[in-house]
């Protein structure tokens, strides 16, 4: 029995697509481990994430991928192993698992190899590693700038004829927004807020519309007294916090185009930017990037699932993948 998978292991979430079935798993890239005589898996995914701040002693809650890089290969291996166990049927005969796995385009050779090693130890028999922008070229089917902005990193790449001409991975994405909001509220309102509150602010009122009048009531803890404190946060206030973050990304795009060969730069300018990833869903971002760069911006359908959708298409096209990666044999 052969199981054909596409796997997107992000710093925030891991998504698995099974050929013939679609997306079969989407869970936080988090695992809780207990260290006794041997390591014991306490919880994985959403259940493990709910344990943050609630465990002590010999139990740890671990995020094994940080900024797109594997920082705890043993923990990630156990996490992927558990995820695979969930989606593979129980059988006397162990299935042969083939997997196409996307990674950020800016990883080193050693960092890329680490994904292959972890997947192999987790029970994947045949592994193909592909840069996320290359995978997305199958979905977009045209040349241009691919921008994938997720939880921890943003990939920006000029893609031409299924090849990355210029590409970079930046540690500027959803987590950077959360941290900027936390720092701002600490400085301006003299409060500490929970991570869940930060996420709520981002999801409900963060936008790149400078005149957005939305606001939200927030509960935090006063830094000086430790008492609970209620205060109002406006979308306009958050705009001033997050716009410099995206300013960095647009500066990279403009710089990247200036170094690209003339013909490719002209073609890229004509086709514009293809935007996806969870953070791409911030209201007004497409228009803001278009205004800052002077380029057309296309927000892909279901942006948070664009990478796994592209991988899913490629999982049934092994010859296409071989061509993309210049391989003679998969």
Q: What residue spans do the PLM features occupy?
A:
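Nucleotide/phosphate-binding catalytic cleft detector across ATP-hydrolyzing
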Residues: 1-149, 159-273, 280-302, 307, ...
């Amino acid at each position: 029995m052969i199981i054909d998978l596409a796997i997107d292991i992000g710093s925030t979430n891991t998504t698995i697509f099974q050929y013939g079935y679609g997306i079969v798993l989407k869970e936080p890239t988090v695992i809780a481990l207990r260290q006794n005589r041997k390591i014991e898996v306490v919880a994985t995914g959403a259940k493990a994430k709910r344990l943050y701040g609630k465990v002590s002693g010999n139990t740890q809650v671990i995020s094994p991928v940080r900024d797109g890089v594997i920082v705890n290969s043993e923990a990630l291996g156990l996490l992927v192993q558990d995820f695979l166990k969930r989606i593979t049927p129980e059988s006397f005969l162990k299935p042969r698992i083939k997997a196409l796995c996307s990674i950020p385009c800016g990883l080193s050779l050693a960092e890329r190899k680490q994904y292959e090693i972890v997947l192999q130890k987790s029970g994947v028999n045949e592994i193909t590693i592909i840069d996320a922008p290359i995978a997305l070229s199958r979905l977009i089917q045209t040349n241009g700038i691919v921008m994938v902005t997720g939880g921890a990193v943003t990939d920006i790449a000029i893609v031409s004829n299924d090849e990355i001409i210029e590409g970079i991975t930046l540690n500027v994405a959803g987590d950077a927004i959360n941290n900027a909001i936390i720092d701002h509220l600490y400085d301006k309102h003299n409060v500490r807020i929970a991570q869940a509150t930060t996420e709520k602010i981002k999801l409900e009122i963060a936008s790149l519309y400078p005149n957005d009048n939305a606001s939200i009531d927030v509960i935090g803890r006063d830094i000086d007294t430790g008492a609970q404190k209620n205060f109002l946060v406006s979308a306009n206030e958050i705009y001033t916090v997050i716009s410099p973050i995206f300013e960095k990304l647009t500066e990279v795009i403009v710089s990247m185009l200036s170094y690209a060969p003339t013909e490719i730069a002209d073609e890229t300018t004509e086709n514009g930017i293809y935007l996806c990833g969870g953070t791409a869903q911030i209201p007004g971002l497409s228009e803001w990037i278009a205004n800052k760069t002077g380029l057309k911006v296309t927000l892909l359908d279901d942006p948070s699932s664009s990478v796994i959708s592209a991988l899913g298409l490629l999982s049934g096209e092994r010859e296409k993948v071989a061509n993309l990666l210049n391989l003679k044999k998969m």
